[in-house]
Structure formats: structure tokens, C-alpha cells
Amino acid sequence: MKAAEIREKFLKFFESKGHTIVRSSSLVPGNDPTLLFTNSGMVQFKDVFLGAETRPYSRATTAQRSVRAGGKHNDLENVGYTARHHTFFEMLGNFSFGDYFKRDAIHYAWELLTTVYKLPADKLWVTVYHDDDEAYDIWAKEVGVPAERIIRIGDNKGARYASDNFWQMGDTGPCGPCSEIFYDHGPGVWGGPPGSPEEDGDRYIEIWNLVFMQFNRDAQGNMTRLPKPCVDTGMGLERIAAVLQHVHSNYEIDLFQQLIKASARETGVADLANNSLKVIADHIRACSFLIVDGVIPGNEGRGYVLRRIVRRAIRHGYKLGRKGPFFHKLVADLVAEMGAAYPELKEAEQRVTDVLRQEEERFFETIEHGMSILEAALADLDAAGGKTLDGELAFKLHDTYGFPLDLTADVCRERGVTVDEPAFDDAMARQREQARAAGKFKATQGLEYTGAKTTFHGYEEIAFDDAKVVALYVEGASVGEVKAGESAVVVLDHTPFYAESGGQVGDQGVLANAATRFAVADTLKVQADVIGHHGELEQGVLKVGDAVRAEIDAARRARTARNHSATHLMHKALRDVLGSHVQQKGSLVDADKTRFDFAHNAPLTDDEIRRVEAIVNEQVLANAPGIVRVMPYDDAVKGGAMALFGEKYGDEVRVLDLGFSRELCGGTHVHRTGDIGLFKIVAEGGVAAGIRRVEAITGDNAVRYVQALDARVNAAAAALKAQPSELIQRIGQVQDQVKSLEKELGALKSKLASSQGDELAQQAVEVGGVHVLAATLDGADAKTLRETVDKLKDKLKSAAIVLAAVDGGKVSLIAGVTADASKKVKAGELVNFVAQQVGGKGGGRPDMAQAGGTEPANLPAALAGVKGWVEERL
């Protein structure tokens, strides 16, 4: 049974049991800033389990794309060397949100494994938490698993509830026992059952974990039963595929075999068991899907992890003899294997390929030199019998050649060598480098709020009377009142304030009553449906239970709405002008501007920018109405609405039709496109490989910008004594005049240099049959210096010459040596002798070289030393 069929059967089985098939969420978590990557099926449901979000279904099933590389969950260094470690994997799961519990979860799992997948029942073992008698009895008395194949696992990690069979979301919150299902590969494979001293062997392999969330743990460690217990299960697709395909390594399943063959094709390796091929096959999955989800190789956070994975794959290809870009060519093979299950991969194929190719080209520019340095160091270390690589060298490889520390460590590990990481860290600190380790994401200080959700009125109103204060927070702690001068977060039962999301900034404004006034500087979400008003109490005392009038800064909101609506129109215009590959990769919409990041591999031309502006302004002039509808997500997407990168959507979504644009959006917008007034792009540039950024302004900001531009044009025209309409023509005339004058100046300099050259030739000193000359040529540029050196070489026949010129505190140097003398006196060495004394460096051919410097005060002494330097070499 192939992996694709296993995935399909899993989802269809649970759909037949009343579960809603929910699409895989992004690898970039939209609801958990503490998590680097989505690493399990439950991540997208975390807020549901915590009660902060509701869904229209109580049963769900998913095939979740997951990554474990960086931070707490880091499998990177093991990938390729073990049978079951991966950076990217698929987690099959079924979930119950207060619906069914242990009995159904266990029966469903058993039915799927034994009836649908047809695994022999006598090959399956199960574990339960040691005091979970309920689960034990279901397995033993209802399912019929013999007692000798049911193992109770106690607290085996040093504390109460610290067990492989007790799951906890964190130090507090939902938790509960779990039951794991193992497959027995038989006595031909070494290993013992779970809980035994030999449990780390490969005979008994965990294939499914059933988590029963039935408790809530408070800060004191007390456990209370949840009113609605939940189920969260996870089964790795690669693991169950290995079992069903009767192989012992995940890399032997059909999906990986095709990618390994493709890796062998691109690297020219015949041995398909080579570990480096496994590394490459694994890494193309992680890298491709991370790029699909908007991650771009970089030097921080997620981008840094992606860069590490890409470079690790490249290094293994290099190890196999591939000295040029190859990794990006595997994207097509991955699409062939997984494109049907994940259409987003196929849609992004060209973009993924381009990003990987660019990253490869960048790395291959430095890898050969860096690898040669590392190989030489390891050879020296081996000769000396050493086992630890100098941390300073590891840092040099990182700083100069772009080798992440773990890449250097990976190479060393293959030679039985470790890296002196403390020394590396010391070097990093001294250099004050900003490259950060992958897991340093900082969680925003959470506010513990358990009340009702906030009712948002901001789509219709700019103010709400009699809003009730339901919670107050000062420095993250819940308080009963706030005094004048204190900064706080206020939660209301009703508000017109929009909380920052979807790239749009939060509202500002005022909360006030007869006795108090609270200035709102920002509005952020405390939970999915709970809005926090951040600011300072300017007067009075504000207490929980007080009623206030909540009023936003309407002018600021209007400017923000104009920019947000213009962003939608610009997005559509960019797709029309550049192509359908354009996808939003980030945005910031505030009252001053809109900043829009999107997937595209080339700078926009002036013509493309003008076309985008024209299309958007045409939509503005059409004064089309903005129409908002709420509908199921699937219906919205089928109807042509665009879903945007980084956004987390529920099953009911808000669709905005604005002119020719249709997008899913929860932000605030203009009522008609004409309200935008005027649209103007003011900046365009690149922010990462394959990602461009456009900044634009609207309304009164755009009018002021155009007026200022007009004023500058008028001022420039006046300075050139021309009418504004004649400015381009006049600039052309001035440029022609400048070129003519530069040509005339060059001729004069050449004539002057020629006459000076005749005089300089007389200053040459003969040393060992070679004329040596070191002098300053006043007013000469680099071209004049070179021409003069050539003339002097012709005149003197056998010579070693250094000429210098000083301009604006900078030294220019040219050295020339005739062919007969260049075997002993090389121009590159000669010019560097002088350059080092004037704060510079240079180089070139044995007969001609140039250099520069920044310390002209040292030039006379440096030139005076040339005669002796040449004399030593003749």
C-alpha cells in the first residue's frame, strides 16, 4: 500500500465516522508565537483545546505537514543516519473536541489498523499510563488485546505525571494520559517491548499515540477534571507506511525511494543506500514546503533554520562530488510525489525552484574555499591526534564562508571530531554577530483571561457607549483597578476598536466616562475573540465593572482603511501585470502607508510600476462599492476569493469584494473604491530571495507626495533655467556638455601627464640595470596614472615604477614593471609594499597592478622606500 493510499484511507475512514477533514495548516504557526514550526497535528487546534476558539465541528481529522528542525524539537543532526528521523514528516490525526473519548478513540484506532490496513492483531502491542484503568479495561475487555501485550508505563522521568504516557501542553493547562500502539517486527529484529531495558531497539516501533485530555493542571500542580475531555491522536505517515510496506526504515518506503533515486540522478551516485542521498531526499521536502508557506532563507529565526537545512543538503551533495547547483532540480520530483495531496506545492513549484536555485548559487560561491579550509584543519588535527576543532576556526567558517555551526559540526562528526562550541560562542560574542540560534523565538507575555469574548462593533461604528470593563492588567498581572499615570491593558465586553491582525495595525482612541480617561495607544488580541486595549490612564481611577464610552480615532482609522483597501486592489493589479504566481507574503497597513511583500523573482520595471498604478487608480475612479459577505471557507475559495499567507482562517470567513478584487479579510475598509482618492507607489525593492516589497500611499498622503514632487520638479527646472515641460530636454543638454568637458579635461590631463612623464623619467634611479622610479603625479586620475606608467616603461625600457596621486584624502597607486624585470620584481607585490604603508591594499598582474589607501600623510616615506625594496630583489 503506497503512502498516498495510506493517507487517503486514513482521512476517509475518519470521515465515515463523522469527522470533518480539515486541510493541513501552514508550517508557520498562526496561533502560537512560542513555536518555531508546526510540529504536530494538534497545533492548529490549540486554541480549540484551550477554549479560546470554537469550530463548527466537534470531530476533525487531518494529514498535517510538520517540521522538526530547530528549537526544542530538533531532529536535524540525526536525519539521514537513523531509520526514522526526519526534518519534514506528515502527521495523521483524529481529534475530538468534547465529543467522544477513550472508548471510541481506542475502537477507531483498532478498527483502522486491523480492518482497513489489515495489520495482524497479534503484532500490535499497547501501552497505557500506569493508573489509567479505564483505558486498560477498554483494550483488554472490549478490544480483546491479551494482558501480556498491554503494558502500564509509570512516571519514568523523575516527577509525578512525568511519563512517556502522560501528555502535557505546558506547565499548566490541559493534560492527560495517553495510550501508544506499537508494531512488533518479530524476533528477527533486536529490541524489547516498551518499558523494557531493550526498548530502544527496532523490534517494537511506536506507530500511533492516543492522547486523552481529561485534566486541567493549575500553577500549583493540582489536577481537576475537564468538563469536556478531548482526544488528540497522531500517527506518522512515514512510520505506518514502513510497517505496511514491510520495510524497517522510513527511507525504504515508496515516497522516499523516488526522491532518493532523484537525488542519485542529480549527484551521479549509484549506491542508493548512501546516507547522503537520504539527507538530500529528506531535506528537499522540508525546504520546499517551508518555502511554500512563505519562509525564505535568511539569517534569523525560521529563515535561518531553512538556510541551515538547504546548506546541509548542498554539503552532502558536495561530499558526493557535485560541485554545482543541483538541489533545486529535485523540486519537480517532489511535486510528482506529493503535488496531488498538497496542491499548494504544485502551484508554487516555480517559485520554490527559483528560491532554492538562488540560495544554492549563493552558497556555492563560497563552499569550495570554506570546505578546503575545514578539510585542511581536520587533516592537521588528525595528524596531531586531536579530537576537537578550534572554535575560532569554526567561527571564521561561519562569519566568512557562511557555514552554520551545525554544518561544520556535521562534517566533524563524520571524522569523530567535536567542535569547541564555547570558543565559538566567545568569538561570536566578541564580534557581536546577530545570527541567532533557531529556537530563540520569544513568547509575548500572555494574559490569563477566562471571561467571555469581546463583541466587536468596529465594522459599523466608530464609538460604543456603555462598554463594560471586564478585565484590567498591569505589567501582565490581573488587577481590580488602574490609577492615573499607569500603563495597562483594558478588556471590554463591547468595543469598536480593531485589534491588530492581517497586517493591519490596531486602532487608537479613548475610553472615557465622566471621571476617567484612558488613552488607547494600540489594540491587540488577548485571545482569538478577546480584544485588549493597550494604553495609559490619563485621569481618574478605572475599575473592573466600570462603564465607558469607547471611541476610536476616526481620522486615523479612515486613513488606515484607505491603505488597506488599496492593498487589495494593488495585489490584484500585481497579479494582472506580473502573473498569477504573485502571492502576498506579508504586509503592514497603517495610517501612513501600505507595505506589501509578495513572491516575485525580479525587480519591477518602471513600466510595470506605472501599469500597476494605472490599474489601481482606474478602480478608484470607478467608485465601486465594497461588498462584504460571510460564508464557509471552502465556498469562498471555490468562488475565487484569495486566502493570504500567514493568516489563520476559521470555517466561516469574511469575504470582501472590492472592484475587481475578491479576498478573505477581517480588516476595515472603505465603503467605495473612490474613497481611496489617489494611489501612488513610492518604493520598490527586494527583501529576500524571491520576495519583493512595494510601499504605497493613498488619499491626502498621496496628494501631498505628488505636490512635493511637483515642487522639486519646478525647483530643478528653475535651477537649469528651463520650463518644467522642458526639464528632460535641458538635462540631456547639460549631460552632453558635461561629457564634452570631461573629454576635454581628459585630453588636457593626458597632455599634462605626458609632459610630466618626460620630467619624471629623468628622476629614475638605476639599480642593478633596472630603472626605479617612485613619484607623485599631481592631479592625475587612475586612467592617467596607467597611461603615464605605460609611457615611462616604453621610454625607460627596463624599469620598476610606482606612481601615486592624492585626491580628497585618498591615495591612488599604480605600479608597472617591464617584462625583463618582472621575474624578480612583481608589480602586485611592489604596489602592496607601498599600499600597506598608506592604509590600503591592492593587486594585479606581474607587469601592472593598482592599489588604494586612506593615509596620504605616509605616502612620501612609502615612496622613498621603493628603491631599497627593489634593490633587495635584484
Curated annotation (Swiss-Prot):
Q: What is its main location?
A: cytoplasm
Pfam families in UniProt: DHHA1 (PF02272), tRNA-synt_2c (PF01411), tRNA_SAD (PF07973)
Q: Does the keyword Metal-binding apply?
A: yes
Co-factor note (free text):
Binds 1 zinc ion per subunit.
List localization entries. Answer: Cytoplasm
Residue ranges annotated as coiled coil are none
Which protein is depicted?
Answer: Alanine--tRNA ligase
Q: Which organism is it from?
A: Burkholderia thailandensis (strain ATCC 700388 / DSM 13276 / CCUG 48851 / CIP 106301 / E264)
